A protein has these predicted regions:
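Core nucleotide-handling region used for phosphoryl-transfer chemistry
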Residues: 1-175
Length: 175
């Protein structure tokens, strides 16, 4: 989600058109109008964009979700290079803290900021977490690792991968 010429710009899967963009936009527009405006002003003031995970009952998904939800993953500057880096971690943390303050003023369960579940300090801790997650079969899509430089890597779990493979095998003859 970004702002261009004072208008919110919705994008999904690297495009501003299509079903997923419409789902995202429609969900976002169910938020209180004043909250939408505060988010827009936050983005404009800081020249940044928000990254979301959009959960919609209208989008068939391998993992069953009981309700629609907008998970804020990150807020990033609208530039390709930030002081020699691609991601400014302190900028992101500060903007997310601002957003958190805004969200606390509203009684909505539709939008929230993704929380850190566990922080690791050694390679052994990281290896143990990855092995544990990749060998579990709980009903989740997976997990996201964020390093100290703000780079994110998404791991799909075995439950998700198994059912995605099965779904694709079943649907292949019909495509």
């Amino acid at each position: 989600l970004g702002v261009i010429n004072d208008e919110l710009v919705f994008a999904s899967k690297s495009t501003t058109e299509g079903m997923h963009v419409d789902l995202f936009k429609n969900l976002f527009q169910t938020l209180p109008t004043s909250l939408q405006e505060e988010i827009k002003e936050l983005l404009k003031r800081n020249c940044c964009s928000m990254m979301f995970e959009v959960i919609s009952q209208e989008d068939t998904h391998i993992i069953k979700y009981d309700q629609d939800h907008l998970y804020v993953l990150d807020m990033i500057q609208n530039t390709l290079d930030v002081n020699g880096k691609h991601i400014d971690v302190s900028f992101s943390r500060e903007r997310l803290a601002e957003l958190d303050s805004i969200l606390k003023k509203y009684d909505t369960q539709l939008i929230s900021i993704v929380k850190t579940i566990q922080q690791v300090n050694t390679m052994d801790e990281l290896t143990n977490i990855i092995n544990k997650e990749l060998n579990s079969h709980h009903e989740s899509e997976g997990f996201v690792l964020v390093d100290s430089n703000g780079f994110m890597t998404k791991f799909k779990g075995p439950y998700y991968n198994t059912w995605r493979y099965r779904r694709n095998r079943i649907l292949r003859p019909y495509q």
